[in-house]
Design a protein with these regions (language model features):
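N-terminal pre-domain/capping segments
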Residues: 1-68, 72, 76-94
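Active-site beta-loop-alpha junctions enriched in small/polar residues
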Residues: 7-11, 34-36, 68-71, 109-111, ...
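A short alpha/beta connector and helix-capping loop motif
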Residues: 192-207
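Charged catalytic cores and adjacent phosphate/nucleic-acid-binding surfaces used
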Residues: 5, 180, 190, 200-201
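Residues that form generic nucleotide/phosphate-binding pockets
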Residues: 55, 163, 205
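Conserved strand-to-helix beginnings and helix N-cap segments that scaffold or border functional pockets
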Residues: 15-18, 42, 116-120, 153-157, ...
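Active-site acidic/histidine proton-transfer and metal-coordination neighborhood
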Residues: 74-180, 190
Length: 207
């Protein structure tokens, strides 16, 4: 079965996300966990969350994709911004327990002149620290592939694998089933992967 949906606005609440998906024949959807430009998240309305869960269960929804705000930069040169990113992610994990078995997608960050290796190291550190804080969660974390603009890390499949390998090393065990990848086709095309002419080869390389 094909799982298909699109990014929706949370303006009509959590139940509204499920209802909108049903209206267009979708069986999943994506949404921002908070304002994409950052800031404090709205308190979860538990009744609203229960209504969404009911819609998802009754209609056999696939896991939904929650997107972290763009302001999250786990490999910033500023320690304060790195801590802010970590605490924001921990908070989002707690909030997503109201929508069990979600996928939580985030941009691995920009190294801001420190170099890709430093950026990869810092982001992997944050991932391991987050999982040490959210031991009992049904949410799976996804590293989004990036286009490599500016000082973005995660442009190549090799860089994404480095982040995962280092995160597992620092966590002390495998994160299989808890950490994965969001393959953003727009980003990888912009980053140089020819998915138009050689999609099968690109997917094989990714695997």
């Amino acid at each position: 079965m094909l799982n298909i949906g699109y990014h929706e606005s949370t303006a009509n609440g959590l139940e509204g996300l499920g209802l909108e998906a049903l209206e267009v024949g979708a069986n999943t959807f994506a949404f921002f966990t908070r304002n994409p430009r950052g800031g404090k998240a709205k308190d979860i309305d538990e009744v609203d969350a229960q209504k969404l869960s009911k819609i998802m269960t009754e209609n056999n929804f696939a896991p939904v994709v929650a997107h972290a705000p763009y302001t999250m930069n786990p490999c910033s040169a500023d320690p304060g911004l790195r801590e802010y990113a970590k605490q924001m992610m921990i908070d989002d994990f707690a909030r997503l327990e109201y929508i069990p078995n979600s996928l939580y997608n985030f941009h691995p960050g920009s190294h801001t002149g420190q170099g890709s290796d430093v950026g990869i190291d810092l982001t992997s550190t944050m991932i391991s620290e987050v999982f040490k804080n959210v031991k009992n969660t049904s949410t799976k974390l996804l590293i989004e592939t990036m286009s490599g603009k500016g000082s973005e890390i995660g442009r190549t499949f090799e860089e994404v694998k480095q982040i995962i390998d280092l995160a597992e090393q620092k966590f002390g065990s495998s994160l299989k089933g808890r950490l994965g990848v969001c393959l953003d086709t727009c980003h990888i095309w912009d980053g140089g992967y020819d998915i138009v002419s050689n999609l099968d080869d690109v997917i094989e390389e990714f695997d």
